[in-house]
A protein has these predicted regions:
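C-terminal amphipathic alpha-helical segment
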Residues: 22-88, 93-94
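Conserved hydrophobic/aromatic beta-strand scaffold that supports enzyme active sites
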Residues: 2, 11-13, 59, 80-82, ...
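Short acidic-glycine-tyrosine-enriched beta hairpin
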Residues: 1-2, 109-128
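A short hydrophobic beta-strand segment most commonly corresponding to one strand
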Residues: 4, 8-29, 134-142
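Glycine- and acidic-residue-biased ligand/ion/polar-headgroup-sensing regions
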Residues: 8, 82-112, 116
Length: 142
């Protein structure tokens, strides 16, 4: 996926691991030795499909005591759900991990405090975990 990150943006780059990055532009940045970093324009063009568009996602909401879960993106590799919590909610699935990125607010998980931009991982074998507080987070699962 060709993309850029501009000043002042916060992104959550949730993707299948590929271990490949092709740099098509680098803003003149330099490495530790002062050299410009290599660009990979030809390689990037070889593997890019510029005609493909993502399917539109019709967000689905599940309202529970203490919060609202909204599925914002799903594909064969992962699902991303936004959680808006104002109380205590159960998070976690028995068949997959849950990666949590807190976007706003604060809360606790098992007595441990978390806040804006904190990230934590709930293993599949943890079962349901209680999150408490007033916060917004992205939950990523397989």
């Amino acid at each position: 996926t060709i993309h850029a990150i501009g000043k002042g943006l916060l992104i959550a780059e949730i993707q299948q691991n590929s271990n490949v990055t092709y740099r098509v532009y680098d803003y003149g940045r330099r490495d530790a030795q002062g050299n410009t970093r290599p660009l990979h324009v030809e390689k990037a063009l070889e593997v890019s499909d510029l005609t493909r568009a993502a399917d539109a996602v019709e967000p689905t909401q599940v309202v529970v005591d203490g919060g609202v879960f909204t599925e914002v993106s799903t594909c064969q590799y992962f699902t991303v759900t936004e959680l808006k919590a104002d109380g205590t909610v159960a998070v976690g699935k028995p068949d997959t991990f849950t990666a949590v990125l807190v976007l706003e607010g604060e809360g606790t998980i098992d007595g441990e405090a978390f806040g804006r931009y904190d990230t934590f991982f709930i293993p599949a074998d943890a079962g349901e975990v209680k999150l408490s507080g007033c916060f917004k987070a992205l939950l990523s699962t397989l």
